[in-house]
Curated annotation (Swiss-Prot):
Protein task: Plays a role in the control of cell shape and motility in the trabecular meshwork.
Native source organism of the sequence: Homo sapiens
GO molecular function terms noted in the UniProt entry: collagen binding
InterPro entries: ECM_Assembly_Org, LCCL, LCCL_sf, VWF_A, vWFA_dom_sf
Protein name: Cochlin
Top-level taxon in the UniProt lineage: Eukaryota
BP-aspect Gene Ontology terms: regulation of cell shape; sensory perception of sound
Occurrences of domain LCCL (ranges): 28-121
Disordered as annotated region, ranges: 128-159
Domain VWFA per the UniProt entry, residue ranges: 165-346, 367-537
Main location: secreted
Post-translational modification remark: N-glycosylated. A 50 kDa form is created by proteolytic cleavage.
Known tissue expression: Expressed in inner ear structures; the cochlea and the vestibule.
Disease listed for this protein: Deafness, autosomal dominant, 9: A form of non-syndromic hearing loss characterized by onset in the fourth or fifth decade of life and initially involves the high frequencies. Hearing loss is progressive and usually complete by the sixth decade. In addition to cochlear involvement, DFNA9 patients also exhibit a spectrum of vestibular dysfunctions. Penetrance of the vestibular symptoms is often incomplete, and some patients are minimally affected, whereas others suffer from severe balance disturbances and episodes of vertigo.
Length: 550
């Protein structure tokens, strides 16, 4: 049975008739955080336990008695007088959405107004209180406020399951106009509310695209939804051409910096709002954003009508600007009216960490060169096993023109570049070329081969933002010195993994490998033993990559 409002004639108050106890009445209350929201509770009725010492000034509470579901449950409970700031049990009842959530100052918390929200909740004392009788009516008159509770300096942690650094790039052009610009801000505010902004959750900033882009506020400026909402509300309409491409490039290059609050290891996201179509080239800006490891989402509103298509530079601009043209990064709304239903699906996308394919990871931000022993002692059949080993490592990585890059050199006394980092930009092509490498046969000069690879393979891409790795596979002792060339490679920022088979001396493997030697040098007696080493090398590459990002 859902909760219902009934009037109490002559009393000047309304009564909220709450449903009676369900079969799970004996269950212990669920422990929640200070900032668990009503929308996080999926039941019609739930008993929860609020912690003590929550920072009152950072509670986000919308409404009075009936609260928008984006409100903090514990904040609403303190606001209503159900508990004090020392915490305690609270019963939460889900209610339908409504309009006109009012703003009331009570018990040290100033709740905020909200014109409309899709779901609501109310709170009463928890199961230990005397209000357990079935169908008991609870008065909605204001509880005595008493003394204002003391504020604490603690910070809101936010939604830890939605870690992202997000820039909202809003349309501030004459194309959208003042009225739709305000509707756009309202939508962005709703998205920001639902994200669960906090110190350990998502951080957001705002950029306005117009004649010239303007960064309205950075990631580091606000870490609570309340402050972000106020900042969005204060953003003024600029006008001018939309110049979305110019603004996107500016955002990718200038917004996501350490000084501006970007966090290492957290996905960087730009949500671009386009009302109609951009007035400049957005494809190049999308490429720049991907090169900087930024995940670009496009929210397009009001597609051009057939008579306007001639004014659009490129009707496929969305596909060319997003992180990946797979449907995940593009989002369309028919207009700026009735957009509430589009908020949650967009938030779910922004909080799906594993889908952020343009973020820099060990799988898409490395250059890996393979130095393959083609000496006579290997033999053709074993050489094929070495190529299979190389392929199994290479196919793990996200190879593309802006992602991971693979190169291969075969050596005996001589060296032969089988393919360089810039020759192939798809995984299919790279694997096909590896399969077709021809066995050279000859002596073993590993030191010269290392120097050759550093100079001719890594040299041309020295400006690459990717981390460089060299995987050496050899079956015997080198006729020349390996320690000096390997040290030079290390000094050039190249991490070396050495993999030895059969007669390869352990001393040579350690001399070539990066530190710590035990996790960068591997040995197997048989060529068939190379397969288990594949996962060791991949884990090592990812470990070294992550350490370099700290």
């Amino acid at each position: 049975m859902s909760a219902a409002w009934i009037p109490a004639l002559g009393l000047g108050v309304c009564l909220l008739l709450l449903p009676g106890p369900a079969g799970s009445e004996g269950a212990a209350p669920i422990a929640i955080t200070c900032f668990t929201r009503g929308l996080d509770i999926r039941k019609e009725k739930a008993d929860v336990l609020c912690p003590g010492g929550c920072p009152l000034e950072e509670f986000s509470v919308y409404g009075n008695i009936v609260y928008a579901s984006v409100s903090s449950i514990c904040g609403a409970a303190v606001h209503r007088g159900v508990i004090s700031n020392s915490g305690g049990p609270v019963r939460v009842y889900s209610l339908p959405g409504r309009e006109n959530y009012s703003s009331v100052d009570a018990n040290g918390i100033q709740s905020q107004m909200l014109s409309r929200w899709s779901a609501s909740f109310t709170v009463t004392k928890g199961k230990s209180s005397t209000q357990e009788a079935t169908g008991q009516a609870v008065s909605t008159a204001h509880p005595p406020t008493g003394k204002r509770l003391k504020k604490t300096p603690e910070k809101k942690t936010g939604n830890k399951d939605c870690k992202a650094d997000i820039a909202f790039l809003i349309d501030g052009s004459f194309n959208i106009g003042q009225r739709r610009f305000n509707l756009q801000k309202n939508f962005v505010g709703k998205v920001a509310l639902m994200l669960g902004i906090g110190t350990e959750g998502p951080h957001v900033g705002l950029v306005q695209a117009s004649e010239h882009p303007k960064i309205e506020f950075y990631l580091k400026n606000f870490t609570s939804a309340k402050d972000v909402l106020f900042a969005i509300k204060e953003v003024g309409f600029r006008g001018g051409n939309s110049n979305t491409g110019k603004a996107l490039k500016h955002t990718a290059q200038k917004f996501f910096t350490v000084d501006a609050g970007v966090r290492k290891g957290i996905p960087k996201v730009v949500v671009v709002f386009i009302d109609g179509w951009p007035s400049d080239d957005i494809e190049e800006a999308g490429i720049v954003a991907r090169e900087f490891g930024v995940n670009v989402f496009i929210v397009s509103v009001a597609k051009p009508i057939p008579e306007e298509l001639g004014m659009v530079q490129d009707v496929t601009f969305v596909d060319k600007a997003v992180c990946r043209n797979n449907g995940f990064f593009s989002y369309h709304m028919p207009n700026w009216f009735g957009t509430t239903k589009y908020v949650k699906p967009l938030v779910q996308k922004l909080c799906t960490h594993e889908q952020m394919m343009c973020s820099k990871t060990c799988y898409n931000s490395v250059n890996i060169a393979f130095l393959i022993d083609g000496s006579s002692s290997v033999g053709d059949s074993n050489f094929r096993l070495m190529l299979e080993f190389v392929s199994n490592i290479a196919k793990t990585f996200e190879i593309s023109d802006i992602g991971a890059k693979i190169a291969a050199v075969q050596f005996t006394y001589d060296q032969r570049t089988e393919f360089s980092f810039t020759d192939y930009s798809t995984k299919e092509n790279v694997l096909a070329v590896i399969r077709n490498i021809r066995y050279m046969s000859g002596g073993t000069a590993t030191g010269d081969a290392i120097s050759f690879t550093v100079r001719n393979v890594f040299g041309p891409i020295r400006e690459s933002p990717n981390k460089n790795f060299l995987v050496i596979v050899t079956d015997g002792q080198s006729y020349d010195d390996v320690q000096g060339p390997a040290a030079a490679a290390h000094d050039a920022g190249i991490t070396i993994f050495s993999v030895g088979v059969a007669w390869a001396p352990l001393d040579d493997l350690k001399d070539m490998a990066s530190k710590p030697k035990e996790s960068h040098a591997f040995f197997t007696r048989e060529f068939t033993g190379l397969e288990p080493i594949v996962s060791d090398v991949i884990r090592g590459i990812c470990r070294d990559f992550l350490e370099s990002q700290q």
